[in-house]
From Swiss-Prot:
One of its GO terms (molecular function) is metal ion binding. Disruption phenotype: RNAi-mediated knockdown causes 63 percent embryonic lethality. Embryonic lethality is further increased in simultaneous RNAi-mediated knockdown of mppa-1 and mppb-1 or ucr-1 and mppa-1. It comes from Caenorhabditis elegans. Heterodimer of mppa-1 (alpha) and mppb-1 (beta) subunits, forming the mitochondrial processing protease (MPP) in which mppa-1 is involved in substrate recognition and binding and mppb-1 is the catalytic subunit. SUPFAM superfamilies: LuxS/MPP-like metallohydrolase (SSF63411). It is found in: Mitochondrion matrix. This is Mitochondrial-processing peptidase subunit alpha.
Length: 514
């Protein structure tokens, strides 16, 4: 049977080989700019036809849990759970509790007495697992062989709904988080992580997205009962999406229905593990405030024994939009247009080198070590940032250049530059989704945020429709907000927030000059 099915493909391969042999002499004489004289018998897909290989399905279980899948080829799959959790929901709980939950993942549970047992079960199915918390999402994910989906889902459901914590495991998690908090400032490659955390604190002061993810000092207050209390509020079916890439939908739904039963969760079967009073999850809308966070620090220790100059860092933030906003795609194109990165770009020329942060900042000012734009979007708000690193004596000049980059966008952009930014963004989107774990994360995040799965072709079409007037409109939207400012390192020469606010409000750089 298998042989009969393969005969047509063998014939096709033979025809291709014969065509190549017949045209070999011609091909050797033709320049690379001339197409080979070979017939292409493949039929193009008509416009409006459903894209090949897109078979996403979403099912909502009676308990409110959403299950989504997208089948793919191959022997290995990626499965996992996305939860509306993270530091933005820590109001009322000790700050840092979401990172403690992250470190406690895949420890002992009702079915597994130790972490060793968990990983022994994973090894049986060639499985690897991970748990990562962001500002608004907790992600438990695993990759394994197709035959091991049921066993791996068992591991995931146990670590999410049936964990067993004790004082020893909690203390170990606290030590791990404390070490990371102390280690991050000592690693030059971690500066971007810290700057991102700080600009959120400055932009959304003391609320939701602005709660700190790193460097908090309240972990000593966290008790075992607090962890269970947080899980009982955040790990509810209505706040969760279970996803699988490379699995059959109906069978996967059946597996999830067996393993994800809230009535069997640790805090339901053993209510004594909960504290006497559990705060409600903070569902308030993010409030962009604007603000300033200055960390005047000696960073000389980061350069000792390393080929890095002594740098200071500045971040300018302006109010962006949520991923549900009509301007979300336009903001993404704007970020692609500005682009940026470090002075050395691994991978060689062509990797974003035509973006403005390269052409107008790093290529013209040798003292700028890095410059990059980011668009951080959440369910209800966002912050658009531009970051630069330079020697301390040039840090205010770097801020002036960043503001200038935003101000000049009011004049619009050239058609070729905009087309390049759109093409690069589409390419980035499509190429990333070729990686199975990335496809999984994209799928579960969309179902978690939108309730359904939007295909990348939909976004590609929206990207292509972004015009010059859209760029001008979202630029004006940025400039209408109060700025946020973060300075890190030797920032004595960096202007204050009041001067920056005047420069943005009056569209005039003179307020930033000494």
């Amino acid at each position: 049977m298998l042989l009969r099915k393969s005969i047509p493909y063998i014939k096709i391969c033979r025809d291709i080989s014969a065509s190549v042999r017949n045209n070999k002499e011609i091909a050797q004489k033709l320049p690379l700019s001339v197409p080979l004289p070979m017939e292409n018998n493949s039929k193009s897909i008509e416009k409006g036809c459903p894209p090949m290989g897109r078979n996403s399905r979403v099912t909502r279980l009676p308990n409110g849990l959403k299950v989504c899948t997208e089948d793919t080829y191959g022997d290995f799959v990626t499965v996992g759970v996305a939860i509306e959790s993270g530091c933005r929901y820590e109001n009322g709980f000790p700050f840092g509790i979401s990172r403690i939950v992250e470190k406690l993942a895949y420890n002992s549970s009702e079915s597994f007495s130790s972490r060793d047992e968990v990983f022994a079960k994973l090894e049986e199915n060639s499985g690897i697992v991970d748990c990562q918390s962001t500002r608004d999402t907790m992600m438990y994910a695993a990759s394994c062989h197709r035959d091991g989906v049921d066993s791996v889902i068992h591991v995931l459901s146990d670590t999410i709904w049936k964990p067993i914590f004790d004082e020893q495991s909690l203390e170990q998690a606290k030590l791990t988080v404390s070490y990371e908090n102390q280690d991050l400032p000592n690693r030059i490659e971690a500066i971007e992580i810290l700057l991102t955390d700080w600009i959120h604190q400055a932009a959304f002061q003391n609320n939701t997205i602005g709660y700190p993810k790193f460097g908090n000092n309240s972990m000593d207050k966290i008790r075992v009962s607090d962890v269970y209390g947080f899980l009982s509020r955040a790990h509810t079916p209505q706040r969760m999406v279970v996803g699988g890439v490379g699995v059959g939908h109906d069978e996967f739904v059946s597996i999830i229905s067996r393993h994800f039963d809230l009535n069997k969760s640790t805090w339901t079967t053993q209510p004594t593990v909960l504290p006497a009073k559990i705060p409600e999850i903070d569902e308030s809308r993010a409030q962009y405030t604007g603000g300033e966070l200055r960390l005047d620090t000696d960073l000389t220790k980061l350069t000792i024994g390393k080929p890095y100059p002594l740098l200071s860092h500045v971040v300018l933030g302006l109010e962006g939009c949520s991923y549900k906003d009509e301007d979300f795609v336009a903001f993404c194109v704007l970020q692609s247009l500005l682009g940026g990165g470090g002075a050395f770009s691994a991978g060689g020329p062509g990797k974003g080198m035509y973006a403005r942060m390269y052409t107008e900042l790093m290529n013209r000012h040798h003292w700028i070590y890095s410059a990059i734009a980011h668009n951080h979007s959440y369910s209800d708000s966002g912050v658009f940032t531009v970051t630069a690193s330079s020697p301390p004596e040039n840090i205010n000049d770097a801020l002036i250049l960043l503001v200038h980059q935003i101000l000049q966008l009011q004049q619009g952009v050239e058609p070729t530059e905009l087309a390049r930014a759109r093409t690069q963004l589409r390419s980035h989107l499509m190429m990333n989704l070729e990686v199975r774990p990335v496809l999984f994360e994209d799928m579960v995040r969309q179902v978690l945020g939108h309730g359904d799965r939007k295909q990348p072709e939909e976004y590609a079409e929206k990207i292509e429709k972004v015009t010059n007037s859209d760029i001008i409109r979202v630029t004006e939207r940025l400039l209408a907000s109060k700025p946020s400012l973060v300075g890190y390192g030797d920032i004595k020469k960096l202007k204050d927030l009041r001067s920056l606010d005047q420069a943005v409000a009056k569209r005039d750089l003179k307020y930033l000059f000494n």
